[in-house]
Amino acid sequence: MNQSILITGANIGIGKEAARQLALKKETKKVILFCRNQSKAEAAKKDLEEKTGKKMFEIIIADVSDANSVRKAVETIKEPIDAIILNAGGVVGKTAGNVTPSGMNVLAATNILGHVILVEELIKRDKLKKAVLLASAEAVPGVKLLGMKPVSMKISSVDEFAAVLDGSYFGDKFEAIEAYGYVKYAATMWMLSMARKYPDIKFVAMSPGNTKGTGAPDNLPPAMKFMLTYFMMPIVFPLIGGMVHTLEVGAKRFVDGVSDERYKSGIFYASKEGKLSGDAVDQSTFYTDLKNTSFQDNADRAIHRFIK
């Protein structure tokens, strides 16, 4: 049972809803909202307290794309944490291809850099006890019906992964939507490598699926945002079936991922092949690169090239 849980990006969307659901579990004693913006975090905390009737929410302010910010935040964590949900991230927006001081582009830094530092620093301090869940995505195995091709790297070498992280893999024209799947692949493979390094801690990668009510469309180009918000999500996806679900359902995947023994360490769970909703299943049954331990370790080594 997880008595204390930290959630990154917990002031909105799936992260906030996961915090609400976790607070209502009888074993939960503390939920830490790990957020970038103080005022938004305070507003989320107030709303969560009102909705749950619980006074168990705490706030830690840090920017997951900034290594030093995360390291400073770790120093403020005095008591062990049972579980962490690495939820912050997404497509990011217009600045996605910009290079950060770490050498990673903004997209990679936001989805990977701070999360790796947070987890590894807490383990080093013996402050992480039971479980880590990473928000991954169906963009990794792809969704044929929507024209989303699976991530396909030549040899998944350290250099290839590093090129994804600094953006050079994509050449002169960096498209965040295309790069997103590759960044999530790198993050997911790091998680699977961690499962082998630390067998006493559960490491699960989990896609929330295609979830309504999140801030995800906000970072898309205007035309795509309009199409997704007003046409695809409310009309097309429900007609197709197995392609969209509510915020509560998406967040429950995360809650179950850290709490339910059905979900095993070292596995990436997401929707069934070709779907974006429904049961969360082991993706390695059809996207077999996930099983390659050399690829997993290559992702880990590539990420650590950018961590000083």
Where do the protein language model's features map onto the residues?
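A structural signal for well-ordered alpha-helical scaffolds and beta->alpha junctions
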Residues: H115, K184-A187, L247, Q296, ...
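C-terminal helical subdomain
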Residues: M232-F286, R301, R305
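Amphipathic terminal alpha-helices
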Residues: L290-K308
